[in-house]
Amino acid sequence: MSVLVRLTSKIASLAKSGRIASARQVFDGMPELDTVAWNTMLTSYSRLGLHQEAIALFTQLRFSDAKPDDYSFTAILSTCASLGNVKFGRKIQSLVIRSGFCASLPVNNSLIDMYGKCSDTLSANKVFRDMCCDSRNEVTWCSLLFAYMNAEQFEAALDVFVEMPKRVAFAWNIMISGHAHCGKLESCLSLFKEMLESEFKPDCYTFSSLMNACSADSSNVVYGRMVHAVMLKNGWSSAVEAKNSVLSFYTKLGSRDDAMRELESIEVLTQVSWNSIIDACMKIGETEKALEVFHLAPEKNIVTWTTMITGYGRNGDGEQALRFFVEMMKSGVDSDHFAYGAVLHACSGLALLGHGKMIHGCLIHCGFQGYAYVGNALVNLYAKCGDIKEADRAFGDIANKDLVSWNTMLFAFGVHGLADQALKLYDNMIASGIKPDNVTFIGLLTTCSHSGLVEEGCMIFESMVKDYRIPLEVDHVTCMIDMFGRGGHLAEAKDLATTYSSLVTDSSNNSSWETLLGACSTHWHTELGREVSKVLKIAEPSEEMSFVLLSNLYCSTGRWKEGEDVRREMVERGMKKTPGCSWIEVGNQVSTFVVGDSSHPRLEELSETLNCLQHEMRNPETFGP
């Protein structure tokens, strides 16, 4: 074996074991480099997600004595696909043509895959149509099929699926998983039925997609259990992918007993299994159990760390999420855009502007600022911290804005009372070809409510129902009631609540009635407030909010006895008002304050300052007549 072959094999072995830095040292120390050695290093970077390193290495390869071949191009196109960088991908395609590899089957398949993952179906289809019919294989067809499914162009995908000269099981899975990703359970089940009637049998990936489709909505619990039963019958219950999807299904539904039973039944634990267990524990609120599993995991990759950071953030422990992010950076694990997005969401929950800006600087250095997931988190962070200019700038930096990007910026403008900017943004969103969803209209209606735009709000509400046929939800009704309530239109607010009473009452979320009761308190309408309170007592007999609002209403109108009676009833029912909580970041340190708490180390100094402020506020000379 020659020295060149031996060293190239060593690079591959080191990279496969995760020792990529050592692999690069061997690569840099080689006396000569052929194309195979370059490809081995390039492929290693691409597979490990080190995309910037892969791009830099490919650039070096272009100007070296060794020239890129079809394996080089497939590796760098895979990097472009993972980054979603269609602009760089087009440059690679131009280089492919100039280098004479435009007839290479692996390269063309990689081009279709790259364009598909970047949602550029026109370019993917052009590459496909430019290929000779005889040169296409199953991978070619499946890559084009995935491109259309990824872009949610279901009719075009179906045309490709029907046109395929020879279907394979993977094509069925692409169709099912694509519909599952969009929550189209009926389509998934219909395709699954057709698959059972064909020559192909479902595998663990098929069942995994079906379980994921059932996980999208709690109303699908019956279908989920049925799919699980079929999975057991077909002998796929022990497969890692299927097992993880079942675990995810039960945790998303909040079925703690079923989730724990699935956890205990896992015998062979892969890296994916460890991550799934941690995720499952976090989703059911078992943060201590998740931490225990984290420490037991033999290997901790970027997904493991990100799952912990995300889990702590969702469970309201943003400080612990930040600590884990710092520990991850110290451990030497290369962070990705998902990790940055997760820790930014944690900063948003705590309104930590200083920490968020430092993390923003780090992710710019790593080249992640253009990712939609990161950009959305940045917009949310700056908006919650009151810096709307930075939020708008972060929105502008997002390369490929998705629906979440537009919705997040829409909410940001709305919360800050910038109704004109919010409505203009909505117009730009429609002009960009982005279809609004239920969340979009919650943001629009909230904006109109906070800005007193009653007429515009009514038009938007009507457009949502008639033009876009979006199913009405409790949150939409609540926004409308809040809008009418803030404007003093209590009669209209009551009519709306009465009209949609079945929707409002049948939901476990009684925010609509609570909003109406709050409006009654604001405008001192005791009679309507008492009427609404009766509805809330029937719907939520153990919920203290309706009692607190009614008591405040009585007290605000000087009816102290009735207010005291309501408070007494709360005591008799064993209810307690949830104490208020606030926090502030000063000098990169977070201080938290809870009503009645006296544990803060600077309590005496803070009390003196508050007393001084209260004295000045009550002094008529402070503000003048």
UniProtKB/Swiss-Prot annotation:
Residues 1-7 form a transit peptide. Pfam families: E_motif, PPR, PPR_2. InterPro entries: E_motif (IPR046848), Pentatricopeptide_rpt (IPR002885), PPR_At4g14850-like_plant (IPR046960), TPR-like_helical_dom_sf (IPR011990). Residues 512-587 are annotated as: Type E motif. Residues 588-618 are annotated as: Type E(+) motif. Keywords: Mitochondrion, Repeat, Transit peptide. It is found in: Mitochondrion. One of its GO terms (molecular function) is RNA binding. PPR repeats lie at residues 3-33, 34-68, 69-103, 104-134, 137-167, 168-202, 203-238, 239-269, 270-300, 301-335, 336-370, 371-401, 402-436, 437-471, 473-503. One of its GO terms (cellular component) is mitochondrion. GO terms for biological process: RNA modification. Signal peptide: none annotated. Transmembrane segments: none annotated. The keyword Repeat applies. Belongs to the PPR family. PCMP-E subfamily. This is Pentatricopeptide repeat-containing protein At2g36980, mitochondrial. The gene is PCMP-E73.
